[in-house]
Amino acid sequence: MIVNFTKSEALHKEALEHIVGGVNSPSRSFKAVGGGSPVAMERGKGAYFWDVDGNKYIDYLAAYGPIITGHAHPHVTKAIKTAAENGVLYGTPTALEVKFAKMLKEAMPALDKVRFVNSGTEAVMTTIRVARAYTGRTKIMKFAGCYHGHSDLVLVAAGSGPSTLGTPDSAGVPQSIAEEVITVPFNNVETLKEALDKWGHEVAAILVEPIVGNFGIVEPKPGFLEQVNELAHAAGALVIYDEVITAFRFMYGGAQDLLGVTPDLTALGKIIGGGLPIGAYGGKKEIMEQVAPLGPAYQAGTMAGNPASMSAGIACLEVLKQEGVYEKLDKLGAMLEKGILEQAQKHNINITVNRLKGALTVYFTTNTIEDYDGAQNTDGEMFGKFFKLMLKEGINLAPSKYEAWFLTTEHTAEDIEYTIEAVGRAFAALAK
């Protein structure tokens, strides 16, 4: 049982004096789990973290998904060291970016052409620009609760109706921009049809997380993605897959390979950087040729395709391409899911677990979760208590009821067994 967070608390107090909110991303604060000082980590190795107080944790945050090969994986670390020794930024073309682009195309046949950027936010933002350039239209359709980065156009929430023009979800986003976004519920074909009947002639693209990762792990209903493609193309719109979370997480070829559905454009990030900042987007040749210098849709970046990120990404994919990687993640994920459910039954705790291979979400509810409304109507207060109990047990989770637990190639059966025991102790405390 971890009881000493003295240095983390002192560091957070100091951070509040210098960094807005004491964190560099709001998801790192503990606001969503009842408040308190977030734990400051000092180093990571494999599936483990050590904080500034010297406490050790089994990590299921995985930096919100990118660290699928574990912390400081030797193959990835070696590649980063080599890149650092050779110079991390040139501002010129390199052989590394060509090699990495070819690897991505091999993994995802829908990528005729690829362009590297520096984040998932940038990748999504640019696919939208490209879709608008290609179609000559301005509106974007997205699904409620799906997060696509913090650019103005996608930082919107649904209005009062089941399908509606967006309303700003952040101060600083003009209403006029939010009104270019139509939001509909995930997994609801009828509402999608209604929205396209009304606005389809104005829609440049439908933006989709093919497997949702931002209100927990939620899979599409059978046939849903196929109908999204069919309806979008009938309306003259493109389909953009946001695979920032899903690419290389569930299968080497991403969700589009796993589910057998092909988008027009794909946005990538997280895992493909091996832990370094990265994004990429790609798609059909005739669409991607809208991008400068070939076409009128401008996109550029000083850091884009830098040798350090390219090297880390290549090394990460080389690890993931090894035989048995995804089978191991699935096996450990199934073991963890089974153990959590057994502990919940033992201690009479109401939960639902959504799992796909090596990622899962624990919702404090008995309801089936298949859309954002369902995820919202879960017990956040109970999750907050569970989160802090697990932290004291040495289990590092994301501080939000909406986030996933991510397994890495470095987790072991022993890690899972300890985690299940810790879940049991946390549930026992919650049941009192």
UniProtKB/Swiss-Prot annotation:
GO terms for molecular function: glutamate-1-semialdehyde 2,1-aminomutase activity; pyridoxal phosphate binding; transaminase activity. The keyword Cytoplasm applies. It is found in: Cytoplasm. Its cofactor is pyridoxal 5'-phosphate. It is an enzyme of class 5 (isomerase). One of its GO terms (cellular component) is cytoplasm. It catalyses: (S)-4-amino-5-oxopentanoate = 5-aminolevulinate. One of its GO terms (biological process) is protoporphyrinogen IX biosynthetic process. Gene3D superfamilies: Aspartate Aminotransferase, domain 1 (3.90.1150.10), Type I PLP-dependent aspartate aminotransferase-like (Major domain) (3.40.640.10). Keywords: Cytoplasm, Isomerase, Porphyrin biosynthesis, Pyridoxal phosphate. Homodimer. Belongs to the class-III pyridoxal-phosphate-dependent aminotransferase family. HemL subfamily. This is Glutamate-1-semialdehyde 2,1-aminomutase 1. It comes from Bacillus cytotoxicus (strain DSM 22905 / CIP 110041 / 391-98 / NVH 391-98). The lineage of its organism: Bacteria, Bacillati, Bacillota, Bacilli, Bacillales. The gene is hemL1.
